[in-house]
């Protein structure tokens, strides 16, 4: 499971970039928009590998932006929050370890599923991402939705202890 998270979320983007980058460098232009997640900065409990793979993608995005800027290539990451898709019903769940954590894993996942079902429509997220892709200049990172923008800024600016407490209250299944 852990390897699959990184294969899709990190290496999928890195390998795609590796394939297109020579053409972008040759043309001295291009835009790379990586799809991250607010989990990259929120470090969501019981979503360790997902959060870590998205954090790796954001770090990669920042490094790459500095490497290719002089070729006229811009790189950005988008941090969606919950999006209402069929992913929720297709999620493979395991009760392994739930007893060790006092049932907090299943409570946390149930809360995430509720949030996903109330999340934004995929079309809304897609429109937002398309607008970013077409901007003249891009910021390093964009969060989608006011709640997630606030959460992203809070996670990046507040002390880790505050971030961990807030994220823990939201997602730890207590």
What are these regions (language model features)?
Residues 42-48:
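Active-site loop immediately N-terminal to the catalytic Tyr-X3-Lys motif
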Residues 42, 63-73:
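Active-site-adjacent segment of SDR/Rossmann-fold oxidoreductases
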Residues 19-28:
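A short helix-coil junction within the Rossmann-fold of NAD(P)-dependent oxidoreductases
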Residues 1-3:
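Substrate-binding pocket helix/loop in short-chain dehydrogenase/reductase
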Residues 37:
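Residue(s) in the substrate-gating loop at a strand-loop-helix junction
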């Amino acid at each position: 499971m852990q390897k699959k998270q990184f294969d899709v979320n990190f290496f999928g983007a890195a390998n795609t970039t590796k394939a297109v980058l020579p053409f972008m460098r040759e043309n001295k232009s291009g835009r790379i928009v990586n799809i991250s997640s607010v989990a990259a900065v929120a470090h969501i409990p019981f979503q360790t590998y997902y959060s870590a793979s998205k954090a790796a993608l954001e770090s990669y995005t920042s490094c790459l932006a500095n490497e290719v800027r002089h070729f006229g290539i811009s790189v950005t990451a988008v941090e969606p929050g919950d999006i209402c898709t069929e992913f929720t019903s297709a999620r493979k769940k395991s009760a392994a370890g739930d007893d060790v954590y006092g049932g907090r894993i299943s409570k946390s996942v149930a809360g995430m599923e509720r949030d996903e079902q109330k999340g934004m429509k995929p079309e809304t997220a897609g429109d937002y991402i398309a607008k970013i892709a077409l901007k003249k200049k891009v910021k390093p990172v964009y969060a989608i939705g006011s709640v997630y923008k606030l959460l992203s800024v809070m996670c990046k600016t507040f002390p880790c202890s505050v971030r961990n407490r807030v994220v823990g209250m939201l997602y730890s299944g207590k």
